[in-house]
């Protein structure tokens, strides 16, 4: 191969390849997409159809996708519903029902084939295999599949014997299952309890001696106690750490941006300005709203910036400042209007529109950087009960994307208006959102992606979606 003169090539930060310098400037500019794994990982759920298993699989998938690890859930129950169109009763799950056992095995094998496609052909990094997997035989089958394909494996066993937790889970989750469509609550509960008894007949829990060579975490009573064994590698470590920081205690998380700031009025991004007159009015309205909610043991978090601190001061309660909650760093574009950015840095303005999530401001941050900065905040939010987070537009988008399972493409364009509280209530398989406008007008700071994102676009087409400002 002929030698290439120094300076003729540069490294493309998104694709991690060397490209001609002249072409590089026409490509998107951003932070590298993180590659957390040297080989794909399978997370295998284990346990009776009791609380925690599907809850864990969906919650874990949401978290791993949010931090940049492409992850997908493979729910074997869904494969079974597609194979058997009409569910009759628990008899299908009896261990002596040979025909049904064969169908269930074929469904598991079909799911494993889809896992292979996802991890080996679609650039997935983690597959969460959501099934009971209660027998040592089934787990051995999965381990053989993983070895043949070069995947790492982490088992996650959910064990729950608390009657109160089991009853609440049945009430929240199982009665809404497609299996029980058209059934009365009493019929659904009775059948589901019989189904659990069917699984109990062949259930072989992970054993500390027999399974000492496996990587696993056992979760008792949805987080009361944990037992981890041979946790290896980055993905497994982060997975276990995350699972040990979650709980199912009923709670509410309130997200609010600061009150309108002086720089918001002028259409300038970033900076550390104080509140406008209307911003101070919002701070008072927020205080009245929080008092009216009578929230038990509410914690209040802010960033280190004036506008969030001034908003929190009106509450008259202690608050905790997080530097991690500071607004995205716009680097050389701090305190500029969009019009000024287009005039001085038209190429940067276009590059950001091309890939807003990964684009990094010169000497500043990208949304991808911000997600990594906010991970400790998410961990602490998962540990807490009722929390009010007073933050900033980009920060609120990142937090909201985590709780609502939004993609990196959707995240930078989530609407987070000023003077509006979002109340998030975690439920069985997701999060309910209530938007509460507190009747104090404010400027609009939301800018949609323009249709034309080409570097050579006219200024008018670059600025067409810029909101009005003074």
Swiss-Prot record:
<comment type="function">
    <text>Synthesis and degradation of fructose 2,6-bisphosphate.</text>
</comment>
<feature type="region of interest" description="6-phosphofructo-2-kinase">
    <location>
        <begin position="1"/>
        <end position="249"/>
    </location>
</feature>
<feature type="binding site">
    <location>
        <position position="80"/>
    </location>
    <ligand>
        <name>beta-D-fructose 6-phosphate</name>
    </ligand>
</feature>
<feature type="region of interest" description="Fructose-2,6-bisphosphatase">
    <location>
        <begin position="250"/>
        <end position="469"/>
    </location>
</feature>
<feature type="binding site">
    <location>
        <position position="429"/>
    </location>
    <ligand>
        <name>ATP</name>
    </ligand>
</feature>
<keyword id="KW-0511">Multifunctional enzyme</keyword>
<dbReference type="GO" id="GO:0006003">
    <property type="term" value="P:fructose 2,6-bisphosphate metabolic process"/>
</dbReference>
<dbReference type="GO" id="GO:0005524">
    <property type="term" value="F:ATP binding"/>
</dbReference>
<feature type="binding site">
    <location>
        <position position="257"/>
    </location>
    <ligand>
        <name>beta-D-fructose 2,6-bisphosphate</name>
    </ligand>
</feature>
<feature type="binding site">
    <location>
        <begin position="169"/>
        <end position="174"/>
    </location>
    <ligand>
        <name>ATP</name>
    </ligand>
</feature>
<keyword id="KW-0067">ATP-binding</keyword>
<feature type="binding site">
    <location>
        <position position="132"/>
    </location>
    <ligand>
        <name>beta-D-fructose 6-phosphate</name>
    </ligand>
</feature>
<feature type="binding site">
    <location>
        <begin position="47"/>
        <end position="55"/>
    </location>
    <ligand>
        <name>ATP</name>
    </ligand>
</feature>
<dbReference type="GO" id="GO:0043540">
    <property type="term" value="C:6-phosphofructo-2-kinase/fructose-2,6-biphosphatase complex"/>
</dbReference>
<keyword id="KW-0597">Phosphoprotein</keyword>
<dbReference type="Pfam" id="PF00300">
    <property type="entry name" value="His_Phos_1"/>
</dbReference>
<comment type="subunit">
    <text>Homodimer.</text>
</comment>
<feature type="binding site">
    <location>
        <position position="195"/>
    </location>
    <ligand>
        <name>beta-D-fructose 6-phosphate</name>
    </ligand>
</feature>
<feature type="active site" description="Proton donor/acceptor">
    <location>
        <position position="327"/>
    </location>
</feature>
<feature type="binding site">
    <location>
        <position position="138"/>
    </location>
    <ligand>
        <name>beta-D-fructose 6-phosphate</name>
    </ligand>
</feature>
<protein>
    <recommendedName>
        <fullName>6-phosphofructo-2-kinase/fructose-2,6-bisphosphatase</fullName>
        <ecNumber>2.7.1.105</ecNumber>
        <ecNumber>3.1.3.46</ecNumber>
    </recommendedName>
</protein>
<dbReference type="GO" id="GO:0006000">
    <property type="term" value="P:fructose metabolic process"/>
</dbReference>
<dbReference type="GO" id="GO:0004331">
    <property type="term" value="F:fructose-2,6-bisphosphate 2-phosphatase activity"/>
</dbReference>
<dbReference type="InterPro" id="IPR013079">
    <property type="entry name" value="6Phosfructo_kin"/>
</dbReference>
<feature type="binding site">
    <location>
        <begin position="393"/>
        <end position="397"/>
    </location>
    <ligand>
        <name>ATP</name>
    </ligand>
</feature>
<feature type="binding site">
    <location>
        <begin position="349"/>
        <end position="352"/>
    </location>
    <ligand>
        <name>ATP</name>
    </ligand>
</feature>
<feature type="binding site">
    <location>
        <position position="356"/>
    </location>
    <ligand>
        <name>beta-D-fructose 2,6-bisphosphate</name>
    </ligand>
</feature>
<feature type="binding site">
    <location>
        <position position="270"/>
    </location>
    <ligand>
        <name>beta-D-fructose 2,6-bisphosphate</name>
    </ligand>
</feature>
<feature type="binding site">
    <location>
        <position position="367"/>
    </location>
    <ligand>
        <name>beta-D-fructose 2,6-bisphosphate</name>
    </ligand>
</feature>
<comment type="similarity">
    <text>In the C-terminal section; belongs to the phosphoglycerate mutase family.</text>
</comment>
<feature type="binding site">
    <location>
        <position position="174"/>
    </location>
    <ligand>
        <name>beta-D-fructose 6-phosphate</name>
    </ligand>
</feature>
<feature type="binding site">
    <location>
        <position position="104"/>
    </location>
    <ligand>
        <name>beta-D-fructose 6-phosphate</name>
    </ligand>
</feature>
<feature type="binding site">
    <location>
        <position position="393"/>
    </location>
    <ligand>
        <name>beta-D-fructose 2,6-bisphosphate</name>
    </ligand>
</feature>
<feature type="site" description="Transition state stabilizer">
    <location>
        <position position="264"/>
    </location>
</feature>
<feature type="active site">
    <location>
        <position position="130"/>
    </location>
</feature>
<feature type="active site" description="Tele-phosphohistidine intermediate">
    <location>
        <position position="258"/>
    </location>
</feature>
<dbReference type="InterPro" id="IPR027417">
    <property type="entry name" value="P-loop_NTPase"/>
</dbReference>
<feature type="binding site">
    <location>
        <position position="199"/>
    </location>
    <ligand>
        <name>beta-D-fructose 6-phosphate</name>
    </ligand>
</feature>
<dbReference type="InterPro" id="IPR013078">
    <property type="entry name" value="His_Pase_superF_clade-1"/>
</dbReference>
<keyword id="KW-0547">Nucleotide-binding</keyword>
<dbReference type="GO" id="GO:0003873">
    <property type="term" value="F:6-phosphofructo-2-kinase activity"/>
</dbReference>
<keyword id="KW-0808">Transferase</keyword>
